[in-house]
UniProtKB/Swiss-Prot annotation:
It catalyses: a ribonucleoside 5'-phosphate + H2O = a ribonucleoside + phosphate. This is 5'-nucleotidase SurE. It comes from the Bacteria. Keywords: Cytoplasm, Hydrolase, Metal-binding, Nucleotide-binding. A divalent metal cation binds at residues 8-9, 40, 95. InterPro entries: SurE (IPR030048), SurE-like_Pase/nucleotidase (IPR002828), SurE-like_sf (IPR036523).
Length: 251
């Protein structure tokens, strides 16, 4: 397959380099387009009215393109550069840190995959624990081999797969669980501080681990020790409310 590879951790991130190596080993043609620097939390943002520049990156057997933009910018530029031979698949990751629950709303990793499905291309987001329970290469090997087992005919256009690895060794995982997104996530605490000149500023604290929360969802199963696969879609229409409001009179 021709695969467009991206992330939000940046072109030099170990997760991107590791899965690049594994995909190439399996015979895929891999084209990395990733941010020049880390852009975690960029979500679906794009760089409007800002020049986007590209730089070829060579490092041993690795060849990729660094872009001074967001993860979504990287997918857009990548698709433009590959327009004569479009990718069969877009992979975003492997991210350093889980993207489950409400974190999905902020995730540049998931947003990059979502941009792929907006373009009509099958897309997957991979995330591992922030702490390296296993070497990054172990997650990459598993992720690359998992691709062989995914039946993309079961994933309609306009949807992606969001895959997360739990904070235990891959060998100790309970297996793979297909599940829904939780409405629970990390708690973000704001701290008001002052710089050396006494000027106040705000700082978002490091993540606070979530509790098990809502049963049968990605957060729940991840904490139980499962690898989670959650199908997501960019059409955010609330169908039940839509139907109810259609029956409502606004006159």
């Amino acid at each position: 397959m021709n695969i467009l590879l991206t992330n939000d951790d940046g072109i030099h991130a170990s997760g991107l380099r590791a899965i690049y190596n594994e995909l190439v080993k399996l015979g895929h043609n891999v084209f990395p387009f990733a941010p020049t620097v880390e852009r975690s939390g960029a979500s679906n943002s794009v760089s409007l009215n800002v020049p986007l520049t590209t730089q070829d990156v060579y490092d041993g057997d690795f060849k990729g393109t660094a872009i001074n933009g967001t993860p979504v910018d990287c997918v857009k530029v990548g698709l433009a550069k590959l327009h004569e031979n479009p990718p069969d698949l877009i992979i975003s990751g492997i991210n350093a840190g889980h993207n489950v629950g409400t974190d999905i709303l902020y995730s540049g990793t998931v947003a990059a995959a979502m941009e792929g499905c907006v373009a009509g291309i099958p897309s997957i987001a991979f995330s591992r624990p922030r702490e390296e329970v296993d070497p990054t290469q172990s997650y990459a090997e598993h992720a690359a081999n998992l691709l062989k087992k995914i039946d993309f005919s079961l994933v309609p256009k306009g949807q992606i797969l969001n895959i997360n690895y739990p904070s235990i060794s891959i060998k100790k995982t309970l297996g793979i669980k297909v599940c829904a997104m939780s409405t629970q996530g990390w708690e973000h605490k704001l701290h008001k501080k002052k710089d050396d000149n006494g000027k106040p500023y705000w700082f978002i604290s490091p993540y606070i681990p979530y509790s098990h929360g809502i049963s049968q969802t990605d957060v729940f199963f991840l904490l139980e020790g499962w690898i989670t696969i959650t199908p997501l879609m960019f059409n955010m229409t609330a169908q039940t409310t839509l139907s109810n409001l259609e029956q409502h009179s606004f006159t």
